[in-house]
Every structure is written in C-alpha cells, then in structure tokens.
C-alpha cells in the first residue's frame, strides 16, 4: 500500500481516539475551554451519562462570528502563536484539536456571543462532514456547546461505553477535581434534568471550607493540615491529611500551575514525608504547585495528565521539605524513645507504659503472669533464631517494634557527663527479694507452666555478664590482644532479643532487660563526641531550608560562628529569613526548621560543652537504627564505666523468686 496523506475527516477521528475516550473526556475539554475564556460560571447538563447529550454553558469572552467556523477546524487555537508560547503554557488547552475531534464523532452545536456583538451566532457540524453552517441565535455573552449522540458514527467505540451511572460518575469525579482548584468559579451539574452538584464561588475562608467539605468530605476538611510554602520561585499550598486522621479516602489531587496531573514524583515525596508517621495507606492531599512555566513541560501526554519538570529532584525535595515542615508539629507514631541518661530508672517504666505490647506492666515495670509468659516465649524463640541466623537476617530483624516517644522531663539541655555516675555492684539477692516481694503483693495467680518453660529457655542464653569484674577483665585482655596482633577482638555471643526492643541478659542469678535504644543512643553520642573537637563534616542541602528569623538571630550567628562551624552548620540571614545551607550528616534527615531555631535559643546565652552538644545531636539526629549485631559489637567495645551506666538502665526480673513462689504453692 503506497504512502498517502490521510483525509481530514479520518485524521480527526484518529485524533478523537486520543482526546475523546468517554463522555467525561468531552466534559473536560469543553469546560477547560470555558475556563480559558475567562468564565466565572459554568453550567453542565448531562443526559444518559453523556451519551445522549452534553451541554456546557459559560459566561466567558465568547467567540466572534468570523472565527466560529475556524474554531471547529483542526489545529485552530487562540492560545499559542509561537514556539516560545508552547514552552511557557499557562492555559489548559493549546493544541486546537478538541472541538474538531469531538465534532468528528458527534453532532456538535456551538453558540457564542462576544461583548462587542449585537447578536449571537450558532455553528453546527457533525460526523465526518467538515462543512460548518452558521445562523443567528439568541444567547447572552459567553458560549454554549451541545454535543449530541456521542459516537453515533463509530459503533465500536459506543459499545465500549459503560452504564449511564458509571459514565456520569466519571464526569462527577472530574468536576470535583477542577472545582477544588478553581474556587473562584461557580459550577453546577445536572443529570437527566436533576441538579446533582452545585459549587458556589468561594471568596472567603468559610466558603472555601464549605467547598472543601463538599468535595473531600467533612472529616478531611476539619482535620486537614493547611500548607503554604514558598522558596526560590516555587510555591506549594493546599491541604494534607492529618496523621491523627485514620479515615481512608481517595482524595489525591495534585496541580501544577492549576492543571491536574498524576505524577509519581509527587506520590513518592508524600509517602516519604509520612514515612516517619508509619502511614500504611496512601495519605490524602490536595496540593497546588506553582512555578515558572518554562521549568515544566506539559506537552508530554495526549490527555495532558502528565508533566515533566526540568529540575525534578529539586521539585521533589521542595515538596518533601514543605510536607515535613507541616507535619513537624505532630509527633511521629511509634517513634523510638529518646533516652536521657540523667533520668532515673523510671524512664524504662514510662517506656513500658507507652507500649503495653512489650509485656511489662505500666505501673511496676514488671510482667503480669499471663502476658509475660507470651513475651518470654517470644524471647526464647528470638534467642534460638539469633543464634542460628546469619548477619543479614539479624539486620533484617532489627527494630521489629518501636517505643512511643517519651518527652524529656528537663527543660534545658544538660551535659551528659559519665563522671557523675558511680558504678554499682549488683546485689542479686536484695534486688530479687525486694522485687519479688512487690510482685507477690500485687498478684495472686500462680506462674503458668508455659512461663516456667520460657524462663528455662531464657536461662539457656549464653551468660554475658556472669561477673562484672571478670567480664571486663576478659574484654580488656581482648583489647590488649587486638592491639598487639592487629586482629579483631572476639565478641561474646549476642543474647536473646525480647520484642525487638530489649536484650535479655543473665548476670549471676539476675535476668535483666537492657533497652536496645538506650545502647544505640549511647553509641551514637560517643561517636559524635569523638568527632566534635575537630569539627563535624558539613553536607550541603540540595534545597536550602528557609525559616522566619527573629531580630536577634543575626547577632547569635556572629557570636557563635566558630561553634556553628564546629557543628557543621552554615547559616545565613537573608530578607528576614534564616537560610540553612549546610548541616552535619546526623541532622540531614531531621526537622531542620524546628531544630535549628531551638539550637540558636540554646546557645544564645551559653556555650554548651562537648558532651551536651553530642547528646543533643544524638537525640535529634538520624532516625535509622543500627542492626542488632552492629549494636552488640559496639556495646562489647565500650569501657567498663559506660557498660555499667547502661546496665543500670536494665530492668531486673526476679525469675528466681517467681520460681520459688511457684514451687512453694
């Protein structure tokens, strides 16, 4: 078959296959034309799901009489005149294919009147015929387009249409998406002569709240977080679902310069922002991104559903940072506890209270019999798994469950000085007797056989600290050996793990639960304290963070310049905003808009010591945790005083007293 040019009628019908997918596609194209014409009111009438009639009436600028026939021609548009216009598109339409494509598969009537004309004119075209007939008509300023018998000349396309209800649902859903971003427009939607939707123009905050409730639901409108962020030519505003709202909706609307798009980059940024809150479903959001039209290409999809950003990574990080700043006011769900080593042992009991699933009683920090038996059995299974698992399996099992956040009981930052701790010798009998006494008064039920078997399995765990002095002496000998031979010291076998949060350690006749998070925080603090004297490495942010600055912050930056440089921070004041350019790697994933102002207030009147600074960085720094094996190796390499401090944080379990009590009964 020779190559030839397609007839215009056939070319229009081929284009209609891309533009006109279903009645909702027709409504989209025609309503967008109305908005481009400056309309403030758009009325949509639908019959039989749009297959019989689609009528769009607006009060826009209208089309002059001598341009009506041209408007129904292919590639005829008033929105693009040059390549420069194509590279900076702000209108919805620009290809000039919609009316020609629709008229090739339906009977189309266009009636319009401009402000300068004394009368309206009507153009009619249908099917493959390209002839357009004109006649005078009665019509106010604006345009009305009627599309009758959609796909009347393409039976194959008509057979693929769904039921009238389904097709109207698609139209209704599309109208919601455009009504939420164009709040200045009055929309009405009727189906088979019945008014179904009416969105009045929203010019006040109350009216905007009402429209948001109409479209996204009352629960979302009442609990949504309002977002407004602007930086370096990018502007993001809208609403995101509150982490405290557990409802599941399909409200996922994202607009670029007013155009609704579906973009994986945006979905990734939203999910990453909500990751700290352990969001298990797609969060709901209505976000409007405004940027220079030269920085985005909208001419990449036939239906204009997708766009391409020239600086996609920059846009992604801007959206992520804006969402994280908005979510910073909400504590993360199930976030790791942040230990303060100056607090007493009650902090562990508070941790148990915040997480009842860990098997510890909120009031005493000890286990109830029925619940603790399950926890002990879990620990025994964990012990067997960790003895036989590989390193990668152990890393995968780290952080199975998490604490709830424990607020610090102290109002100011205090140095974490190890010298204030006096190592204590553990009196096993006294500790066991006292705890067993409290336990016997609080419970009366006997210990179950399952619990006794669990205790026996736990006691099969390798004894990590049978005697503190002997253990440290052996470890010191290992350090001596490594210094002499240069080989890695032998690390003791890792104990069992309870609920992914505690190590179960035997010490003489004591059974102790050592919090993993306390060890990880200590190791992180120790690492930072070794690096601080020479200064932390600075890492530039891909997108600097801007925070509204107080008047005296400029003086603080000058007075504490050397301290901030030591912390790896590069901060400047510009246009009454604090610009965060560089941060140490420990703070890169933190809420900088909250932490840096907090740091400036702290250092305003004092120069904190290195232990205090390292404690602050460790507490607020990176959230990803070390694997169990790496944490245990780090613990084994700690000095004796440091291990003693951590072991004092462990909770003693009076297993011997419980067994004696059970046997006596």
Curated annotation (Swiss-Prot):
The keyword Cell membrane does not apply. One of its GO terms (cellular component) is mismatch repair complex. Residues 426-445 have a biased composition (Low complexity). Residues 348-370, 385-445 are annotated as: Disordered. Pfam families: DNA_mis_repair (PF01119), HATPase_c_3 (PF13589), MutL_C (PF08676). InterPro entries: DNA_mismatch_repair_CS, DNA_mismatch_repair_MutL, DNA_mismatch_S5_2-like, HATPase_C_sf, MutL/Mlh/PMS, MutL/Mlh/Pms-like, MutL_C, MutL_C_dimsub. Residues 348-361, 407-421 have a biased composition (Polar residues). One of its GO terms (biological process) is mismatch repair. GO terms for molecular function: ATP binding; ATP hydrolysis activity; ATP-dependent DNA damage sensor activity; mismatched DNA binding. Keywords: DNA damage, DNA repair. PANTHER family: DNA MISMATCH REPAIR PROTEIN MLH, PMS, MUTL, DNA MISMATCH REPAIR PROTEIN MLH1. Belongs to the DNA mismatch repair MutL/HexB family. HAMAP family: DNA_mis_repair. This protein is involved in the repair of mismatches in DNA. It is required for dam-dependent methyl-directed DNA mismatch repair. May act as a 'molecular matchmaker', a protein that promotes the formation of a stable complex between two or more DNA-binding proteins in an ATP-dependent manner without itself being part of a final effector complex. This is DNA mismatch repair protein MutL. It comes from Shewanella denitrificans (strain OS217 / ATCC BAA-1090 / DSM 15013).
